[in-house]
Amino acid sequence: PEDKEQAQQIQHEDLLSLVLKVLRSWNDPLLHMVSEVQDIQEAPDTILWKAVEIEEQTKRLLEGMERIVGRIHPGDLENEIYSPWPGPSAAIPGDESSRLFAFYNLLHCLRRDSHKIDNYLKLLKCRLIHDGNC
């Protein structure tokens, strides 16, 4: 969905599925980011720590969402198909500033997707817990 009105038109089962797809789509990029940050010689430890923390929090959120969807639709999780990440572009030069810019872009996309997920979950909470009275 492009906006709040479109999201409100989507059935809650489809919205849950969309959240799972978006979360699953971040598995490989976040693993790659953590691996790449470890290879940067002059990267402060806090950057590596934050990259690992982001990866772990995303995994925990995905696991929680899978449990919720598993209770609503047992057995559907195994049939869920998502597009795997094709990997980093070979066109990205290996110099450190280009890699840092690639991380910035990756985190910008993650932030955008995180906001979408947050909004979808708030919409689901409103529908399912408060009967749409939000």
Curated annotation (Swiss-Prot):
Disulfide bonds: C126-C134
Pfam families reported for this sequence: Hormone_1 (PF00103)
Localization: Secreted
Key word Disulfide bond present: yes
An annotated GO BP: positive regulation of receptor signaling pathway via JAK-STAT
Keyword Transmembrane helix: no
Any one GO molecular-function label of the UniProt entry: hormone activity
Any one of the GO CC terms: extracellular space
Xref: CDD domains: prolactin_like
Principal subcellular localization: secreted
Keywords, comma-separated and alphabetical: Disulfide bond, Hormone, Secreted
UniProt similarity note: Belongs to the somatotropin/prolactin family.
Protein name: Prolactin
Annotated source species: Bufo japonicus (Japanese common toad)
